Amino acid sequence: MVAVPTAWCSVALALLLALQEGKGQVAAAPDHPAPSPRARGSHLRPRRCSCSSWLDKECVYFCHLDIIWVNTPGQTAPYGLGNPPRRRRRSLPKRCECSSSGDPACATFCHRRPWAEAVVVPGSRSPADVFQAGQRWTSAGELLQQLREISATKIRFARQHQEAEREPRPMYPRRRKT
Protein backbone atom coordinates (compact mmCIF):
# COMPACT_ATOMS: atom_id res chain seq x y z
CA MET A 1 0.00 0.00 0.00
CA VAL A 2 2.89 2.37 0.66
CA ALA A 3 4.14 2.06 -2.92
CA VAL A 4 1.00 3.60 -4.51
CA PRO A 5 1.17 7.02 -2.74
CA THR A 6 4.92 7.14 -3.32
CA ALA A 7 4.41 6.52 -7.04
CA TRP A 8 1.82 9.31 -7.23
CA CYS A 9 4.15 11.70 -5.40
CA SER A 10 6.95 10.85 -7.83
CA VAL A 11 4.71 11.49 -10.83
CA ALA A 12 3.46 14.76 -9.36
CA LEU A 13 6.99 15.92 -8.58
CA ALA A 14 8.21 15.06 -12.08
CA LEU A 15 5.25 16.93 -13.58
CA LEU A 16 5.92 20.01 -11.44
CA LEU A 17 9.58 20.05 -12.44
CA ALA A 18 8.70 19.72 -16.12
CA LEU A 19 6.20 22.57 -15.88
CA GLN A 20 8.63 24.77 -13.94
CA GLU A 21 11.33 24.45 -16.62
CA GLY A 22 8.92 25.43 -19.38
CA LYS A 23 7.45 28.36 -17.43
CA GLY A 24 7.55 31.65 -19.32
CA GLN A 25 9.00 30.20 -22.52
CA VAL A 26 7.29 30.94 -25.81
CA ALA A 27 6.72 28.06 -28.20
CA ALA A 28 9.04 28.16 -31.19
CA ALA A 29 7.41 29.80 -34.18
CA PRO A 30 8.74 30.49 -37.69
CA ASP A 31 9.12 34.21 -36.81
CA HIS A 32 10.86 33.57 -33.46
CA PRO A 33 13.47 30.79 -33.32
CA ALA A 34 13.81 28.82 -30.09
CA PRO A 35 16.19 30.51 -27.65
CA SER A 36 19.60 28.96 -27.12
CA PRO A 37 20.46 27.44 -23.73
CA ARG A 38 22.68 30.46 -22.92
CA ALA A 39 19.83 32.87 -23.71
CA ARG A 40 17.39 31.04 -21.43
CA GLY A 41 19.43 32.02 -18.39
CA SER A 42 19.16 35.73 -19.20
CA HIS A 43 15.41 35.41 -19.90
CA LEU A 44 15.18 37.26 -23.21
CA ARG A 45 11.68 38.41 -24.02
CA PRO A 46 10.32 38.22 -27.55
CA ARG A 47 9.89 41.66 -28.99
CA ARG A 48 9.07 43.04 -32.34
CA CYS A 49 11.14 46.21 -31.95
CA SER A 50 13.12 48.28 -29.46
CA CYS A 51 11.68 51.62 -28.29
CA SER A 52 13.90 54.66 -27.95
CA SER A 53 11.96 55.81 -24.85
CA TRP A 54 10.28 53.98 -21.96
CA LEU A 55 7.89 56.92 -21.63
CA ASP A 56 6.30 56.13 -25.00
CA LYS A 57 3.69 53.67 -23.66
CA GLU A 58 2.17 53.03 -27.10
CA CYS A 59 5.58 52.00 -28.44
CA VAL A 60 6.32 49.77 -25.45
CA TYR A 61 2.94 48.06 -25.84
CA PHE A 62 3.47 47.55 -29.58
CA CYS A 63 7.07 46.33 -29.42
CA HIS A 64 7.10 44.02 -26.40
CA LEU A 65 4.99 40.98 -27.18
CA ASP A 66 4.64 39.31 -23.80
CA ILE A 67 4.19 42.10 -21.28
CA ILE A 68 1.25 42.29 -18.91
CA TRP A 69 -0.49 45.67 -18.63
CA VAL A 70 -2.02 46.51 -15.26
CA ASN A 71 -4.43 49.43 -15.00
CA THR A 72 -3.66 51.65 -12.05
CA PRO A 73 -5.57 54.84 -11.19
CA GLY A 74 -2.92 57.23 -12.47
CA GLN A 75 -1.29 55.32 -15.28
CA THR A 76 -0.94 52.02 -17.07
CA ALA A 77 2.10 50.20 -15.76
CA PRO A 78 3.95 47.57 -17.82
CA TYR A 79 5.07 44.55 -15.82
CA GLY A 80 7.66 42.10 -17.01
CA LEU A 81 10.00 44.58 -18.67
CA GLY A 82 12.74 44.55 -16.08
CA ASN A 83 14.18 47.65 -14.47
CA PRO A 84 14.00 50.63 -16.89
CA PRO A 85 16.84 52.68 -15.29
CA ARG A 86 19.33 49.84 -15.88
CA ARG A 87 18.57 49.78 -19.59
CA ARG A 88 21.38 51.24 -21.65
CA ARG A 89 20.61 54.70 -22.96
CA ARG A 90 20.03 55.21 -26.65
CA SER A 91 19.75 58.24 -28.83
CA LEU A 92 17.71 56.90 -31.69
CA PRO A 93 16.39 59.43 -34.19
CA LYS A 94 13.29 57.28 -34.76
CA ARG A 95 10.57 56.16 -32.40
CA CYS A 96 11.86 52.58 -32.41
CA GLU A 97 13.99 50.09 -34.34
CA CYS A 98 12.46 46.91 -35.78
CA SER A 99 14.00 43.52 -35.01
CA SER A 100 13.08 42.21 -38.45
CA SER A 101 13.42 44.34 -41.58
CA GLY A 102 10.69 42.23 -43.23
CA ASP A 103 7.94 43.30 -40.79
CA PRO A 104 5.85 45.93 -42.64
CA ALA A 105 3.59 46.66 -39.64
CA CYS A 106 6.61 47.40 -37.48
CA ALA A 107 8.24 49.55 -40.15
CA THR A 108 5.04 51.58 -40.51
CA PHE A 109 4.71 52.04 -36.74
CA CYS A 110 8.34 52.92 -36.03
CA HIS A 111 8.92 55.24 -38.96
CA ARG A 112 5.68 57.20 -39.04
CA ARG A 113 5.69 60.85 -38.08
CA PRO A 114 4.86 61.85 -34.51
CA TRP A 115 1.37 63.15 -33.73
CA ALA A 116 2.46 66.79 -33.51
CA GLU A 117 3.73 66.74 -37.08
CA ALA A 118 0.58 65.06 -38.38
CA VAL A 119 -1.82 67.64 -36.90
CA VAL A 120 -3.35 69.98 -39.45
CA VAL A 121 -3.16 73.58 -38.32
CA PRO A 122 -5.23 76.21 -40.12
CA GLY A 123 -3.02 78.46 -42.14
CA SER A 124 -0.91 78.59 -45.24
CA ARG A 125 2.09 76.74 -43.81
CA SER A 126 2.49 72.99 -43.69
CA PRO A 127 2.25 71.18 -40.31
CA ALA A 128 5.89 70.12 -40.52
CA ASP A 129 6.94 73.77 -40.82
CA VAL A 130 4.80 74.83 -37.87
CA PHE A 131 5.96 72.13 -35.45
CA GLN A 132 9.65 71.99 -36.32
CA ALA A 133 11.86 71.86 -33.25
CA GLY A 134 13.66 75.07 -32.37
CA GLN A 135 11.56 77.27 -34.67
CA ARG A 136 10.90 80.86 -33.62
CA TRP A 137 8.07 83.02 -34.87
CA THR A 138 9.33 85.79 -37.14
CA SER A 139 7.01 88.27 -35.53
CA ALA A 140 4.46 88.47 -32.76
CA GLY A 141 1.86 89.21 -35.42
CA GLU A 142 2.40 85.82 -37.09
CA LEU A 143 1.83 83.96 -33.82
CA LEU A 144 -1.24 86.07 -33.09
CA GLN A 145 -2.62 85.34 -36.57
CA GLN A 146 -2.19 81.58 -36.05
CA LEU A 147 -3.97 81.76 -32.69
CA ARG A 148 -6.82 83.76 -34.23
CA GLU A 149 -7.24 81.17 -36.99
CA ILE A 150 -7.38 78.36 -34.44
CA SER A 151 -9.90 80.29 -32.34
CA ALA A 152 -12.07 81.03 -35.39
CA THR A 153 -12.05 77.34 -36.35
CA LYS A 154 -13.14 76.33 -32.85
CA ILE A 155 -15.96 78.88 -32.86
CA ARG A 156 -17.12 77.68 -36.29
CA PHE A 157 -17.24 74.05 -35.10
CA ALA A 158 -19.12 75.05 -31.94
CA ARG A 159 -21.75 76.92 -33.99
CA GLN A 160 -22.18 73.97 -36.34
CA HIS A 161 -22.65 71.69 -33.34
CA GLN A 162 -25.28 74.03 -31.84
CA GLU A 163 -27.16 74.24 -35.14
CA ALA A 164 -27.18 70.46 -35.45
CA GLU A 165 -28.70 70.19 -31.98
CA ARG A 166 -31.36 72.83 -32.71
CA GLU A 167 -32.70 71.11 -35.81
CA PRO A 168 -36.07 69.57 -34.97
CA ARG A 169 -36.01 65.84 -34.88
CA PRO A 170 -38.94 63.93 -36.31
CA MET A 171 -41.43 63.10 -33.61
CA TYR A 172 -42.89 59.65 -33.77
CA PRO A 173 -46.09 58.89 -31.90
CA ARG A 174 -45.45 56.96 -28.76
CA ARG A 175 -46.50 53.42 -28.76
CA ARG A 176 -49.24 52.75 -26.28
CA LYS A 177 -49.00 49.87 -23.93
CA THR A 178 -51.82 47.42 -24.30
Curated annotation (Swiss-Prot):
Location of the region described as Disordered in the Swiss-Prot/TrEMBL record: 158-178
Biased segments, Basic and acidic residues type: 160-169
One annotated GO molecular function: hormone activity
One Pfam assignment: Endothelin
Signal sequence, start to end: 1-24
GO cellular component: extracellular space
The keyword Metal-binding belongs to this UniProt entry's keyword annotation: no
Propeptide: 25-46, 70-178
Stretches for region Endothelin-like: 96-111
Annotated InterPro entries: Endothelin, Endothelin_toxin_CS, Endothln-like_toxin
Alphabetical keyword list: Cleavage on pair of basic residues, Disulfide bond, Secreted, Signal, Vasoactive, Vasoconstrictor
Keyword Signal part of the UniProt annotation: yes
Annotated site, Cleavage, chain positions: W69, V70
Biological process per Gene Ontology, one example term: regulation of systemic arterial blood pressure by endothelin
Record-annotated disulphide pairs: C49-C63, C51-C59
Protein location: Secreted
Role summary: Endothelins are endothelium-derived vasoconstrictor peptides.
Membership in a protein family: Belongs to the endothelin/sarafotoxin family.
Protein name as it appears in the record: Endothelin-2
Organism listed in the record: Mustela putorius furo
Name of encoding gene: EDN2
